[in-house]
């Protein structure tokens, strides 16, 4: 592998920094496949959703602690790292800039290559790594992203996506408005639900819309319906739409590996529905360990390793964050 103009023997070590939203994470990955460290701290507001500046301040205050924990966990010093990767986007601007600043400082101080990682691609890559899947159809569901994608001709192509809010955001907002808090609270309440109420499903081709689910949930709550039943109705509606568009993508591509990534992929009910759908199509589905589903530093480090092999680095003075970056805007040449 050529690194900084010199030929370097494997294994390479990459330190990855994740800071797109509520989580600041530092991971360390080796090119031989080992995840040496995965340390994370999450900003938890006292009420409501994420305030970008407050989250960024949280990240700045604990970044040195998370970094030290990761290095100690891996048993290495910063000088042993071959490159520093960071989440360049998509995400909240102030949070992204906090992680990028730390990455630039480390790259400059220790004279390491800097690798700008697409956060969405990283979710997929850590999923491919831990499952061993080669070319899956992917459902990426989180608080800020909802899309169906697969790799084709050098990058991930978006087959379908949300037309308004993300699935995770829909469930979080429902939980907050219902007074029970964001996920996983809505799913916890849903387990005690017994009656399904009608909620309109909005599926257009392989695109989905969740704003109507929120409107319907508010109506049901205002009508005095039992909270557990409303939670059951909302989660079933959201997961049914997601599974339907994923099934359409499987039928279209005729691929037989199914990957579920992102924070909302922790849902055991969603995993169950996807697993049942996969069986109908003789496709393989493997749930990913929770530690790699939410935002984490390990996924940035592992994707950084792949990018480093192909020379996909960036100069410090050109390492701008990209809050609106899409999954299909980044090159992914390491998948055949």
PLM region spans:
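Glycine-rich phosphate-binding loop and adjoining helix at the ATP-binding site
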Residues: 80-125
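A contiguous, well-structured pocket-lining segment that forms one wall/lid of small-molecule binding clefts
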Residues: 77, 187-258, 265-281, 308-311, ...
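A short helix-loop
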Residues: 5-12, 19-20, 36-38, 133-134, ...
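Conserved phosphate-binding/catalytic loops in two-lobed NTP-binding clefts
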Residues: 117, 275-300
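Short glycine-rich phosphate-binding loop at a beta-alpha junction
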Residues: 78-88, 254-264, 286-289
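N-terminal beta-alpha supersecondary unit
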Residues: 11-90, 119
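Glycine-rich phosphate-binding/hydrolytic loop that grips phosphoryl groups
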Residues: 288-330
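Conserved phosphate-binding catalytic cores of ATP/NTP-utilizing and phosphoryl-transfer enzymes
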Residues: 8-11, 116-137, 303
